[in-house]
Amino acid sequence: MTTQSEYDYIIIGAGSAGNTLAARLTEDAGVTVLLLEAGGPDYRLDFRTQMPAALAFPLQGRRYNWAYETEPEPHMDNRRMECGRGKGLGGSSLINGMCYIRGNAMDYDGWAKEPGLEDWSYLDCLPYFRKAETRDIGPNDYHGGEGPVSVTTPKAGNNPLFHAMVEAGVQAGFPRTDDLNGYQQEGFGPMDRTVTPKGRRASTARGYLDEAKKRDTLSIVTHALTDRILFEGKRAVGVAYLVGDSDTRIEVRARKEVLLCGGAIASPQILQRSGVGPAEVLNKLDIPVVHDLPGVGQNLQDHLEMYLQYACTQPVSLYPSLKWWNQPAIGAEWMFLGTGIGASNQFEAGGFIRSSEAFEWPNIQYHFLPVAINYNGTKGVQEHGFQAHVGSMRSPSRGRVHVKSKDPREYPSILFNYMASDQDWQEFRDGIRLTREIMQQPALDPYRGREISPGIDVQSDEALDQFVREHAETAYHPSCSCKMGTDEMAVVDGQGRVHGMQNLRVVDASIMPIITTGNLNAPTIMIAEKIADKIRGRQPLPRSTADYFVAGDKPARGKPLREISHQA
């Protein structure tokens, strides 16, 4: 527990970005940092967060998960949908699926075309991805070998379904790639994961804080719920927070800056509660307006996905591992040897494709899983099976986050506005139909049984749309709600500094202007690494000179090995 009342920097949120900043800022001698986290420690003996294969467990309770819900989503049968966010040291890196996916080079080149974001091109960002990473098979032009984030690659001898699913994607006419984070993201191939060589989850608490905690210049307070940021005029001077169930406000001062790293839900929420945001929202709640900034909480984006599930005709799926009587042996091997089923998140193959020539870079992502079950561990199919998670990457739909009261313990109002555009519906129809073509390729002949979900009778546009409305779920990638840029809806500049304010930055997935093509943990860490150098007054790392794939006029798909006709 801290006793000081003043620090150089106060960081709100010990998630993927906050832990990165805390570690990097305290590398400079004499720089004091207070890291505030509303959740608790990352208990290293709790298999639910430390065992990769147990990734569904933290989503089922509230110890590690804020477990937000959306408002009724108007295009999704008015379902209130899950919006799980990490709570505890590590933030969402403590409960995520551990997929290490950086996004497409064109995502960052697209950001860099926006005024004020010119230094966010892919070749500007790549050195920071490398700085953060230690890849188990060693560094190269795309991968790091000395960073805090431990990345494990799939190995020979893993589940045969991974290999079969990648081969099926290639047989369907799509590219093959040997590294989804390397020269070419587009195509099917092995998927890296944030797991240590000893088979433990490589959260940012493990990667960054374990080293930083040794410095007496870093103070960490857990169970510290931020009430609001304190201002003198337009200058951030400190933070007021509550500890545990107490209503006693503790105030601490920042000599240099307040760094908000709460993520795409909490960061706009804290800004609004502090009086920075759309005046119309704040006035309704009698929150004094410090700065009318209309973009705070707007532009909210996410990835939506569906599961296409198939029975498996050979007993090679992970179905037996779901049975309680098999789990002690799996747990013991993982605990004592760091190997076996427990040591993998089981997302060891995936892919990125263009569903039509209209897209310059991939717009559909696949995760393959050698068992048929919901992401949060519910509704496991009671037989051998496998599934593909399929989702669109850059939906035009935009949502918002608004506070509902001044009370820091009250959850905000969240609306993603999923599937609000015609493009969304076309992408999901195409995604299901292309997946069915992939699943019918010869590589899966030895394994493929009947289609469990959606079911072979779901064929028409109307039937597919209804399936999406009823069954699509979040991929847990909220972002973009405090976007970088210079237009009237931008919240921060290209260094994370809040427009119109002093000594206040937002550094997390909320500042993405447009969501990236893939999972968000790796990009969030990169963003924090890059802005850490700005805060420290350091020269940016030299631009990379690595080559990268641009599709140009290359076709999205070649001729499939086996032609499949769609039923109407």
From Swiss-Prot:
Q: Which InterPro entries match?
A: BetA, FAD/NAD-bd_sf, GMC_OxRdtase, GMC_OxRdtase_N, GMC_OxRtase_C
What residues bind FAD, as annotated? 8-37
Q: Which cofactors are reported in the record for this sequence?
A: FAD
Name the pathway it acts in. Amine and polyamine biosynthesis; betaine biosynthesis via choline pathway; betaine aldehyde from choline (cytochrome c reductase route): step 1/1
Mention one GO biological process in which this protein takes part, according to its record. Answer: glycine betaine biosynthetic process from choline
Q: Which UniProt keywords apply?
A: FAD, Flavoprotein, NAD, Oxidoreductase
Q: Does the keyword NAD belong to this entry?
A: yes
Q: Where is the active site?
A: H477 (proton acceptor)
Instruction: Quote the cellular component terms of the Gene Ontology held in the record.
Output: membrane
Q: Has UniProt tagged this entry with the keyword Transmembrane?
A: no
Q: Which GO terms describe its molecular function?
A: betaine-aldehyde dehydrogenase (NAD+) activity; choline dehydrogenase activity; flavin adenine dinucleotide binding
Q: What does this protein do?
A: Involved in the biosynthesis of the osmoprotectant glycine betaine. Catalyzes the oxidation of choline to betaine aldehyde and betaine aldehyde to glycine betaine at the same rate.
* Descriptive protein name: Oxygen-dependent choline dehydrogenase
